[in-house]
Regions:
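One-carbon transfer enzymes
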Residues: 1-212
């Protein structure tokens, strides 16, 4: 396990060291010491979370690949503020697990899943929380059900490019809160659910035409 800048407090260090001595601390993301140790460890996979942009030498230190999760359906919603922008663009709320490359959320996709919106939501924040939890669950599932069993996760290339998302401003969030209360997540969930296939999504032209 590798902990970077925001996890260097002594109390947090001690918490992790209670469970394992195999914990490494880095002073700087993408720093030379981090790159050297990753190379020395000769790892197959690097799993990241909220880590910022990785430079190519760090990505290449993992023999098979670097995995990350994303609280939206790739390739339709990349960047920030992706849950609100997804709903705004007619994309169902969901989550993805993917291989990291030098682009922003552009790596090959491993798995995607819709947020279950069959029950009502009352704010955008609720949907965002569900998407965050689902993203983490998908990543853990990939680790335990695939990598943990000696399988190398599939790669589904992102052949389609969509406009990057940005954070919603205060007024946009208020508008989206109202749309959420009116059932936008549930409507999109019903619309996208038939396109789901086990482990992936239909990326046909029909699907593309659904995205505004």
């Amino acid at each position: 396990m590798w902990l970077t800048n925001n996890l260097r407090k002594k109390s947090i260090r001690n918490h992790f060291l209670q469970y394992s001595q195999a914990v490494h601390f880095s002073e700087r993301l993408n720093g030379s010491s981090m790159q050297q140790l990753l190379t020395l460890l000769n790892i197959d996979f690097l799993i990241i979370g909220d880590a910022g942009i990785l430079q190519q030498p760090v990505i290449e230190s993992a023999r098979i690949g670097v995995l990350n999760s994303h609280p939206a359906l790739l390739p339709f919603a990349r960047g920030t503020g992706v849950v609100g922008r997804s709903l705004e663009r007619g994309i169902a709320a969901g989550a993805s697990v993917y291989y990291v490359n030098s682009g922003i959320d552009e790596g090959d996709i491993i798995n995607r899943r819709l947020v279950d919106a069959s029950l009502p939501f009352y704010s955008l924040q609720e949907v965002e929380m569900k998407a965050d939890i689902l993203a983490l669950d998908l990543l853990v599932e990939t680790l335990t059900e695939e990598i943990g069993k000696g399988k190398i996760p599939i790669r589904l290339g992102q052949s389609k490019k969509f406009k990057y998302c940005r954070w919603l401003d205060e007024m946009e969030r208020k508008v989206m809160d109202q749309q959420v209360k009116e059932g936008q997540p549930a409507m999109l969930f019903s619309k996208w659910k038939p396109l789901c296939k086990p482990g992936t999504f239909d990326l046909s032209d029909e699907t593309m035409e659904m995205v505004q």
